[in-house]
Design a protein with these regions (language model features):
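Conserved nucleotide-cofactor-binding alpha/beta core module
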Residues: 11-131
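Conserved histidine-centered catalytic loops in small-molecule metabolism enzymes
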Residues: 132-141, 146
Length: 148
């Protein structure tokens, strides 16, 4: 349910460039690639990232770009992104991700304290660069880890 909801909230158009923070098993990256999107996905846990990259390639989603690294910092070389989906809870919306979101883009991110109830937040960046945030529903995600 949550993968479908978060994907739908991005309102992705075919060919859109999307960043996923928190590759995990690679499931959401595969869903995004299946929709015809240009997918960049980053995972901080090396073993998970390497396994997901191999799995995506083996299943025919080799066009999804994968990287092991700290998702808080996003993927500057791939920016700007039409959409960003974050699958780990952050204490706040990371400024590097806001900077990498294209004007007119949307970000879906759980925000709140680790191991507590968080809020799923939709961040919309207007054409002039102003931000609008909307809390959507309570969720519980693993914490966004890394050095930030």
């Amino acid at each position: 349910y949550i993968v479908a909801l978060m994907t739908d909230l991005l309102e992705p158009a075919p060919g859109a460039r999307l960043l996923e923070v928190g590759t995990g098993s690679g499931y959401q990256a595969a869903v995004l690639a299946e929709l015809g999107l240009e997918v960049y996905t980053i995972e901080i846990v090396p073993e998970l990232g390497e396994q997901a990259a191999a799995r995506l390639k083996r299943l025919g989603y080799g066009t999804a770009a994968t990287r092991v690294g700290d998702g808080y910092n996003g993927w500057p070389e791939g920016a700007p992104f039409d959409g960003i989906v974050v699958t780990a809870a952050a204490g706040h919306v990371p400024p590097p991700l806001i900077a990498q979101l294209k004007p007119g883009g949307r970000m879906v991110i759980p925000v709140g304290p680790a191991f507590m109830v968080q809020q799923l937040v939709l961040v919309t960046k207007a054409k002039d660069g102003t931000l609008r945030t909307r809390q959507l529903l309570p969720v519980r995600f693993v914490p966004l880890t890394g050095r930030h």
